[in-house]
Structures are given as structure tokens and as C-alpha cells.
């Protein structure tokens, strides 16, 4: 489903400095309905990999394929088709402070031109999935960190994507809320979504027992079917 083929990403130097190698000659595949962890220390290249898949960054070398299509050859006018198939969750939530939980989730469908009936039905469904039905009309400032992240996950789910990309989604959370978010990602995976989770949290890595791709200085140093935290 997803294939990185000999990908390198090198950023040009600032002033008289050296170029920054974010990713170097990385190749791997992610199968449909797989749950994969991309792990490594800060600066290892995890976020860059996700940005390359979303076509937010262009590789210096190599190709990234999604369902057989080179994502960097998609015309800008057709990017929305790729983005509809991929839901994204970030560490900093990226919620609109002036919108309620319901409105933050509904916004995605409004942009897609969905009817009010569709929006109401789908938002109610995802609120139930993430356990926030009773917080539908609260604003972000009235929610805990764990609740805000669940809103972000609900928003990522609203258009029923095939793939969920989660970039350090528990980085700002306490251990209790961290486990809550991980259980939710596992639930989404059970529904049939492919999940790619970028993290450096050793507890998450060890608890899940899923495939682990370990990055170090932009290179893959391990790719294990049931990996554990090893740095």
C-alpha cells in the first residue's frame, strides 16, 4: 500500500554551514491494515518521513508510493484525493480555539461540501468512537489534554480515511491519557485502518508489540515485526 524507495531528504545549508541530512537512503513498505511504529530520538527523521508521505516535503532522491501512485507526481489540484485517504494526528492538536468539539470535527466535512445531515450523522458517530459525546459543545480550553487529542483523532477519522498518521500524539500527555490514546488507535486499527505511529516513548513501543522501524540519524537501523525499545 505504502512504499518508500531509496528516499533521501537533504536540506541546504544555512549561511556557511553544512547541509542537513534528515533522511538517507530509506526503503520500506507498509501493508494495508498494518500497524507500524516509526521510532527514534528527536531529530532522527520520523516527522520528515510522514511529511514526505503527505507530499508536504519533496525528497532529494527516491520515490514514495501510495497505492501504486508516486505521491510527488500528483498534480496540486488532485492533492485532496490523497489527503482524503489519509488522516493525520499531531502532538499539538491543531484545534480551532473558537470552535466547539463538534464544530472542530465538522469543519473537515464542511470543507468537503457535505450536507448538514451527513455532517450531523458522521460527527455523532466519531464522537461516540472517541468517547466525547458529552463534550460535543465544549471549547478546547474547557477540555483536558487527553480530550483535546481525542478531538484531533475524531477529526482525522471523520472522512473515513484508509490510513492514520499519528506524529507523537501522546507527547504532551500524562501516562493515563497516553494509554487512553493508544487504546483508541488500536480500536481504529481493528476497524480496518492502516496506522503509522511516530513516537520515542519506550512504554508505548514495548506495550504494543507491533512492527517497529527504528531510525537513527535519518537511516533505518532496525525493522522488526515485533520490536521493542532499543536505543
Predicted regions located by residue number:
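Helix-to-loop junction immediately C-terminal to a conserved catalytic motif
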Residues: 54
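Conserved ABC transporter NBD signature motif
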Residues: 62-70, 82
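Short coil-to-helix segment of the ABC ATPase nucleotide-binding domain corresponding to the Q-loop/switch region
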Residues: 99-106
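Conserved ABC ATPase signature
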Residues: 139-143, 147
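A short, proline-enriched helix->beta-strand linker immediately N-terminal to the Walker B motif
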Residues: 158-162
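Catalytic Walker B motif of ABC-type/P-loop ATPase nucleotide-binding domains
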Residues: 164-167
Amino acid at each position: 500500500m505504502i512504499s518508500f524507495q531509496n528516499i533521501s531528504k537533504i536540506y541546504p545549508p544555512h549561511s556557511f554551514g553544512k547541509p542537513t541530512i534528515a533522511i538517507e537512503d530509506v526503503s520500506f513498505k507498509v501493508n494495508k491494515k498494518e500497524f507500524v511504529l516509526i521510532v527514534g530520538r528527536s531529530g532522527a527523521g520520523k516527522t520528515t518521513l510522514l511529511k514526505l508521505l503527505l507530499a508536504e516535503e519533496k525528497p532529494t532522491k527516491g520515490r514514495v508510493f501510495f497505492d501504486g501512485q508516486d505521491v510527488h507526481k500528483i498534480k496540486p489540484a488532485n492533492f485532496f484525493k490523497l489527503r482524503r485517504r489519509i488522516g493525520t494526528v499531531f502532538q499539538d492538536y491543531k484545534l480551532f480555539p473558537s470552535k466547539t468539539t463538534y464544530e472542530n470535527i465538522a469543519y473537515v466535512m464542511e470543507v468537503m461540501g457535505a450536507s448538514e445531515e451527513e455532517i450531523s450523522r458522521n460527527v455523532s458517530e466519531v464522537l461516540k468512537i472517541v468517547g466525547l459525546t458529552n463534550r460535543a459543545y465544549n471549547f478546547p480550553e474547557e477540555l483536558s489534554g487527553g480530550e483535546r487529542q481525542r478531538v484531533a483523532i475524531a477529526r482525522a477519522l471523520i472522512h473515513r480515511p484508509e490510513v492514520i498518521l499519528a506524529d507523537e500524539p501522546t507527547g504532551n500527555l500524562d501516562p493515563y491519557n497516553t494509554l487512553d490514546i493508544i487504546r483508541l488507535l488500536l480500536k481504529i486499527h481493528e476497524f480496518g485502518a492502516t496506522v503509522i505511529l511516530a513516537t520515542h516513548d519506550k512504554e508505548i513501543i514495548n506495550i504494543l508489540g507491533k512492527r517497529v522501524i527504528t531510525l537513527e540519524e535519518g537511516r533505518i537501523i532496525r525493522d522488526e515485526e515485533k520490536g521493542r525499545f532499543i536505543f
